[in-house]
Amino acid sequence: MTVPSDVLSGIRSLRGSGVLPLGATEMTPEGLRVCVDRCATFRGVLCGITPYLRPAAQRQGCVLINCPALHTKQTVPSPDTLALGQLRTVLIADHLGAQLRRQGYTVSFCPALPQDSDIVNFLKTLGIDWPTVPVSWTNEDREEKMKKALENSTYRDREIERGKRRSGGEEIEGERRGIKEDVRINLKQVVQDENLQGYDPSLGTCTVQREALCHLAQLDSATTDFPISTTTALHVTSCQDEFRQQQTAMLWRATGATAVQRLVICGPVKTPGIQMNAAQYLQLRKAQMKDASEMKYGDQVEGQTWDDIIKVMTSATMRFELLSTVHTSPVTLDVQRDSGVSTKGPRGGVFVMYNCARLHTLFSSYEKGVEQGLYPEIPGGTELDFSALKEEGEWLLLFNYLIPFSELLDQSGQILEHEGSTARVNLRTEQVCRFLVSLSKDFSSYYNRVHVLGEPLPHLFNQMFCRLLLLRALRELYHSALDSLNLPPIPQL
């Protein structure tokens, strides 16, 4: 088989972002064999790491992330009333917000929650900074605005209202719900007129309830400063509440809202044989993390520093358990009290944080060696010979993780911009957690096999410095990825 000379010349002259430096090219019976110049690739990536640690593209636009699980029903939600499936939607919403902001989007969250409420403090424990309003705040003006918009909507179904006019006593009950008379909206007509795809065909005529008005008022408030032409609303909800959220989305459309609306549907969270709410789940994982730490470190586990470490590790455990599965699929949790958590088993958040902490320890040891005069400072990358990185594990860490990371960070924005216009959207919220677990397995295997800080002998320094540059880039990658999960790195575990 022969390759035309112009094609061969074109391949050899390729340059640009994402194109690795080429070494030898040769013709074989199977075709053209192209070899990457590994030494030049290590130098190019490790001496210019910044672009690899941020999204491949910066975007513009506004995204409203709406979490129906946090909307007030009869009362403000609390950790004791928040189901695990609902907690999963909140964590996914938080992760999406962090990712989209880094890609350049302006992000707003909905609903705003009462300051210092139990649910706000619970979310803070998990590292979630949700928007709040004063306890005395009301949204009655916007509720009235939404009610009038629906009363005057072209989609109001007056024929059905006339056919089902209620008795006087029932009208009084309607007034208590905030609506003097039933307002019914033909949602099916909204879907048809707007030519919307992927909505439930059984969406019909919906009677507007006070709860829906509160929800619509929150949506309206959260998008006040957003230009409608560039706004996308992501409703992150459980599969059990999908139909209700489709109704709410179409009611909002019926008020005249024109923002693009997409649904991020999350599968259920199962705890076989046990009923458990979000507060109980947090308490269990925190107790298990404390037990594991005391087993390893004994009496050292006390004071504010350890409280902070256990808090972060608990959040990491919960986030990885609930985010590592494709968001449309169910999650099954092991919530037996005696099952415990391990710092070394490759099972998720604890394993990832443990390996990130190992890098912190490595560089602390190196810096102490520099202070003691054992090692010189790492020289500039142009002074190093990267051919010293001969381990296949070193190439694997560069090629499988450092090089593609920026594309991973860019994924959710790409999908929002280019993936159709149906009701549902799959934003692959599991990718960062899975990436970190896979990275931690490969890094752990490499780190257990290779002695990075060798004897302080000049002829060994070049290889040591090359490895330190590689691992410093990995440490920055860990920090960048964990930041999208609102998890700060910890110094020890």
Language-model regions, residue ranges each:
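Non-catalytic interaction-recognition regions
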Residues: 1-493
